[in-house]
Amino acid sequence: MMLLGSPSSGGYGGKFAGASPAGGTTTMAPSAKQPSSRAPPPGITGGRNDLRILSPAAAAAAVGGLEMKKPEAEGIAESLQATHRKELEASIRKQLQGVELSPSPYDTAWVAMVPLRGSSHNPSFPQCVDWILENQWDDGSWSIDGSISTANKDVLSSTLACVLALNKWNVGREHIRRGLSFIGRNFSIAMDDQAVAPIGFGITFPAMLTLANGSGLEVPVRQNDIDSLNHLREMKIQREAGNHSRGRKAYMAYLAEGFGNLLEWDEIMMFQRKNGSLFNCPSSTAGALANYHDDKALQYLQSLVNKFDGVVPTLYPLNIYCQLSMVDALENMGISQYFASEIKSILDMTYSSWLGKDEEIMLDVTTCAMAFRLLRMNGYDVSSDELSHVAGASGFRDSLQGYLNDRKSVLEVYKTSKHSISENDLILDSIGSWSGSLLKEMLCSNGKGTPGREEIEFALKYPFYSTLERLVHRKNIVLFDAKGSQMLKTECMPVHDSQDFLALAVDDFCISQSNYQNELNYLESWVKDNRLDQLHFARQKITYCYLSGAATTFRPEMGYARTSWARTAWLTAVIDDLFDVGGLEQEQENLLALMEKWEEPGEDEYYSEDVKIVFQALYNTVNEIGAKASALQGHDVTKYLVDVWLHVVRCMKVEAEWQRSQHLPTFEEYMESGMVSLGQGCTVMSALFLIGEKLPEGIVELEEYDELFRLMGTCGRLLNDIRGIEREESDGKMTNGVSLLVHASGGSMSVDEAKTEVMKRIDASRRKLLSLVVSEQEGPIPRPCKQLFWKMCKILHLFYYQTDGFSSPKEMVSAVDAVINEPLQLRLL
């Protein structure tokens, strides 16, 4: 895995590999010796802002905010598919098999300062001292990436730490002089309150300045500036002096090298992990070891120095988090299907670590939440009990991430909280409550340009169960951080070659859009060819119907499934309009009679031209889909399609009769019909047999199928009712789930209270549906088929969660444009 590194005497190309805890390999990023100034060292083809999409058109479209026009997209797709797509996939596949970490000059310097036990004048790790001597940039600094054109607080901190390490062992006087000169030239950055700072910079940097002065080093800066930083440090310490929370103690232990003799070392070592480290952080462990001898801590550092040949990363081990982050990125960008076997291997290893309560997962809030979410959604049996330590806000605040109010950790646990599969999952519900509130507070307290703000806003507005996959993919591609580094105590560079991920995702999305546009053109022709556009009563929503299929069944080979989904969804809407608002009773009865016969009628059998148009379109479309599906399945499935249509239309007729007679059914009677009449069962079944899975004969008679349908139908019916009640009541329609609950209460329940009750039922059904879909137990219905029910549920949540998106002419326009029409516009990386 190629990540930018610092220069090293060994030259580029050498890797220091070893077995990682969760499988695969972990290696240190390669580096080169003594580059000139801050130009990229030999062997690096460009800085971190380069985009490695080799097609010129693709590169132009992916950087600089240029629009990717349709002809360009087609050319890019052809070029990438022909010459580079396989290379991109091979590169990503290799990255998934092993993790490469960035060298950390800051952490290496602190490890270098650990004295040899019994000989305080000698280093325990002379290899680290050698690495520092061999890896100074020509401007005098030490940093991960010498191609950075400007200094920052992280580079200042790393440079001062390296200077202290060399001075401690009285070597490298010229290196020290140049390092101090770099610090002096750029010291104004340390005084800038607005500059991005590593975690604990206000504690560790002044402490290092004091250590430098105490060891006889003359830092070429004004004493007033040093005094000012020390004063701010003392204020920070005094402000928290009365805070004895576990989170505060964790923070002090994490900054062990900066707090030094202010710490109670016996208390600090309570945070030591089984591998001997403090927080898997070499600098924290070295800071403790310099003041408190511990054999396990020494062994931890020794293992890292040996493993990485004299240099250490800023965190280790980090394998599980790195690999899960890559899996998450692939899923979020819509390209995970190309790496199914690699992802399964990663998740299998993660699950084994989960069951073994591996500290790399359990002691890191972000990793634990991400592991839970990815494992659950991929069918592994995981319990939210393992998240009980952050069930309340106080538990989160007791962690290091909680004390730091870490945005990424809060967002991760919030997203995870929405993956509940039981209405009694109090842990996830509690996590969702406090983390959602905290995210809203972050939005209020931070400006509009705050990093990650758009991601937080999206997560709060659209829980994962009310999103369409292709919409999410586009958002993540557009917002993708190709640099991807994370600022800890020092900068931690990305764990994978982000450009490869972005290049493949852009290519895949552009190909998809081209397919979608062609398929939508076909559907619009289908509407006209079948004269469906002549139906005055019907909502002309073929684009929205296609959106729901395209945004979920998005793989290129699923084109026929998408168009079948869209045509079926549109026909259910048309027939619903015929029974609900646009048709005479005789027309409704005539259509049902024709469907029950299911044969080509004579001209005199149609009550009206509208019935003729509707039935002919339905008859021809269902038979066509049925023939295609039957050929794929090896047995007749047309009968299932006809039967489900009959069930839907009969329920529509029952509800039409209720409306004409002003009959108010019980809520239970209404739901028995209503969860069918919405028509999702027809839509799902139209694609069920077309996605490449072999299904048993009699599938619709299975108990599991019936339960999947019931739960999906319940969500759909009630979501539709809760958003349509005002409109339907104004039209004089009383057969609505909310209205029926109010009526059944005898006036004791208000409309708002009835809506709350309906939302509870939706929530319970959705959770139960998800539990069936992600169940580890393999039943007769393959998981990809069960996922169609879940995807339909998500579509219904998006369409109806906040408004009646299907009936509103404007609500879905932006979604249609984003998935189908608008070219990608990527930010300058």
Swiss-Prot record:
One of its GO terms (biological process) is defense response. It catalyses: ent-copalyl diphosphate = ent-cassa-12,15-diene + diphosphate. The keyword Manganese does not apply. Its EC number is 4.2.3.28. A motif (DDXXD motif) lies at residues 576-580. Residues 1-50 are annotated as: Disordered. The keyword GTP-binding does not apply. Induction: By chitin oligosaccharide elicitor and UV irradiation. SUPFAM superfamilies: Terpenoid cyclases/Protein prenyltransferases, Terpenoid synthases. Involved in phytocassane phytoalexins biosynthesis. Catalyzes the conversion of ent-copalyl diphosphate to the phytoalexin precursor ent-cassa-12,15-diene. Belongs to the terpene synthase family. The Asp-Asp-Xaa-Xaa-Asp/Glu (DDXXD/E) motif is important for the catalytic activity, presumably through binding to Mg(2+). This is Ent-cassa-12,15-diene synthase. The gene is KSL7.
